Amino acid sequence: MLFSAFALVPDRAAGALPMYGDVNFNEVVDIDDVIALADHLSTGTTTIADDVNGDLEAHIRDITLLIDYLLYGELEFDLYSPPVPDSALVVTVNGVSFAMMPVKGGDYYPYKNWPNHDPEFHVTLSDYYMGMTEVTIELWLAVMGSRPLHAGLYTPKPNEAVDCLSFWDCKDFIARLNELTGLEFHMPTKAQWVYAAMGGQWSGGYTYAGSNDIDEVAWYEGNRLDIYKRLLDKWPGTSYELPVGMKKPNELGIYDMSGNVAELLEFGHVEQGENYDELERDSLYPVYKYGGSNFRNASYCKVIDPIEAMLLHSFTIAIDNGLRLVLQASSLPAGYRSK
């Protein structure tokens, strides 16, 4: 078992939380805690002490973080990043690497299981890559050199999802990223976003991106205060956005497509049967964002029949506006390899 929800054990429920990494409650963090954590995960007997990275869940990544602490002497879950699978395309820009997950395209019936929609409506998607995580502060700084103009006054952690974006902030970022990498990234179209969020050809038909239990896969209005308290206890004055990749990924290995920050989509619309990779651009067309955020309720986080959160203008900025990247597989230079 690689993942488990947990509950406070009775003798600790009313008292202080255990020190980070002290799985055995003996006020010492050592290899015995790694062994105990592995045992707890395999047997499903996890407690709050197994939550090494502070995301209110026990997971195999807590073991990884605990081992890092024993090897390097640091235990800071704000620097955590999810493991990158071999199938990912890894791109590096100015020393910062990020992963793109492959999404197999084909004929796609987006409304097949949606109420009050035409189940026969379909579009065609070619193969593409979707960002394994939302664009982070670290990546934004590597590309742009400074935070978004309207970002808050707090000091963000490098693996937080970047926020406070407008549509044109995203466009400026992508234009600069493409200059630096020689690749052709773009914002997700509506169909690309929903198809990937639902798990593509491996879709389990879940309500949220990877699960019917929103708490497994998303930071949203209903659980954000728990993690905020842990963050503020450890880092007073911390921001109100959250590190990426702390929840379970969906069927494609993509994180946070439900919750955390909402993700702005590309302009455009499409008629039935058209190729959704090439859209008519219209600067007057409204801008949408999908996926909900940690400021929104669960309804906004659905990937089946999601609520379309519309911005009135492409220059509109909201505190939970974030970005996820897309890259067409056909646009990659011949022989391109991860770097």
What are these regions (language model features)?
Residues 4-82, 149-155:
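Cellulosome-associated attachment modules in secreted, modular CAZymes
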Residues 22-28, 50-59, 129-130, 157-167, ...:
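A glycine-rich, coil/turn loop motif that links secondary-structure elements
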Residues 108-116, 121-211, 327-331, 336:
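Active-site microenvironments of metalloenzymes and redox enzymes
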Residues 276-281, 309-317:
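Short proline/glycine-enriched turn/loop segments at secondary-structure junctions
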